Amino acid sequence: AASDVYKRQDKICKKVGEEAAETIIAAKNADNDELKNEINDLLYHVMVLCADRGLEWSEVEEVLNERNEKIGNLKQFHTTDKLS
């Protein structure tokens, strides 16, 4: 039923949000192993979301490749946002 689809999608989206938050927290810590694990968890659940929506991972990669090919696609960092 439609409510089952909504519940499943809601559960997946909540998990993606949780993993995104955990990735942000790990990024602020000094442990790169923790960060790698959290990025892995986030990507896994994003892939689950894609599969649930019938979206092939290759379609996501295609968009990434298109963005990399665009000239001037780099965002300008604020002074406080620049990476060292």
Where are the regions a protein language model picked out?
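An amphipathic alpha-helical micro-motif enriched in hydrophobic residues
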Residues: 16-24, 32-54
